[in-house]
Amino acid sequence: MPLALCCMSHSPLLNLPGPSAELLDQITDAIADARKFVEQFDPELVVTFSPDHYNGFFYRLMPPFCIGTAAAGVGDYGTYQGPLPVDADIANACAESLWESGVDIAISTAMDVDHGTVQPLQELFGDATARPVVPIFINSVATPLGPLSRSRALGAAVGTFLATLDKRVLIVGSGGLSHDPPVPTLATAPPAALDRIVHGAPMTPEQRMARQEAVIKAAHDFAHGQSPLRSLNPDWDRSLLEIFDEGRLSDLDGWTNTFITGEGGNSAHEIRTWVAAFAALAAHGEYQTGNHFYRAAPELIAGFAIRTAVPST
């Protein structure tokens, strides 16, 4: 059961007009380095920890955690649309193992996943369907949210389960870091958006295009200092990366949701995916990190980071 890890930020703006060539070139080079790491490891299975942006999970029933025994990409922001090669047997066995370990997780036999799941797969493999996958959703947007410690417990339990597999497994965490994009909330969403985030009302092509244009404009305004969105926090991002690099995951148990929002923004809670991924790897002992990339990227409305890791022994 050899394990490896790759955590990375995601952004719909990687596939949209707006970001400078200099920024995209730097991120492309960093992703290429991570891709080489993944190619050398040559995983037989990929376990993803990722959020959703009201494309597959909605307030009508919002689990804190969910594992997919079948899944499909919704194709948002130019990402892959269609079924993913989910290993249903392993996903079911993982869920049973989690329940037995005291971590409650929901199951979806028809999980819809968006760019938060699909973009890292496409960037790391060139094709979202290149490897069998077990997708695990972590609610990181729809408040109220559970404590960060529960994401660490989830990851540790998944890591314990992975020890039973005779496969090379890549653990992927997707999201963050400091990050406050324009996401509708129960308190602020206009009627059409409220219907979508609660009931999952489908978007028309015109609505999808309008949302895409709104994201492009929001990023432009943010990058030019003309936005009410919370500023990026590179110091906070680097302190978090240092915790991951040094394996001090238990330090994060004291990070309250209020603290995370105040330091990193409303969508900084996507760091839960990194916490779970690193906890899964740490369940097998000490690890060492590589591919130390970080760039505060206002054009992406994100502190964009990449880390890889392998067990120390």
Swiss-Prot record:
EC class name: oxidoreductase
Active site location: 115, 179
Is Secreted one of the keywords? Answer: no
| Pathway(s) | Aromatic compound metabolism; 3-phenylpropanoate degradation
Which cofactors go with this protein?
A: Fe(2+)
Q: Which Gene3D superfamilies match?
A: LigB-like
Give the molecular function GO annotations: 3-carboxyethylcatechol 2,3-dioxygenase activity; ferrous iron binding
Q: Name one GO biological process term.
A: 3-phenylpropionate catabolic process
The answer to whether the entry has keyword Oxidoreductase is: yes
**Superkingdom assignment:** Bacteria
A Pfam cross-reference name: LigB
Cross-referenced CDD domains, in alphabetical order?
A: MhpB_like
Chain segments annotated as coiled-coil in the UniProt record: none
Q: Which InterPro entries match?
A: DHPP/DHXA_dioxygenase (IPR023789), Xdiol_dOase_suB (IPR004183)
Question: Mind telling me which residue stretches traverse the membrane in this protein?
Answer: none
Catalytic activities:
3-(2,3-dihydroxyphenyl)propanoate + O2 = (2Z,4E)-2-hydroxy-6-oxonona-2,4-dienedioate + H(+); (2E)-3-(2,3-dihydroxyphenyl)prop-2-enoate + O2 = (2Z,4E,7E)-2-hydroxy-6-oxonona-2,4,7-trienedioate + H(+)
Keywords carried by this UniProt record: Aromatic hydrocarbons catabolism, Dioxygenase, Iron, Oxidoreductase
**Assembly and partners?**
Homotetramer.
Q: Which family does it belong to?
A: Belongs to the LigB/MhpB extradiol dioxygenase family.
Spell out the HAMAP family in the cross-references.
Answer: MhpB
Function comment = Catalyzes the non-heme iron(II)-dependent oxidative cleavage of 2,3-dihydroxyphenylpropionic acid and 2,3-dihydroxicinnamic acid into 2-hydroxy-6-ketononadienedioate and 2-hydroxy-6-ketononatrienedioate, respectively.
Write down what this protein is called. 2,3-dihydroxyphenylpropionate/2,3-dihydroxicinnamic acid 1,2-dioxygenase
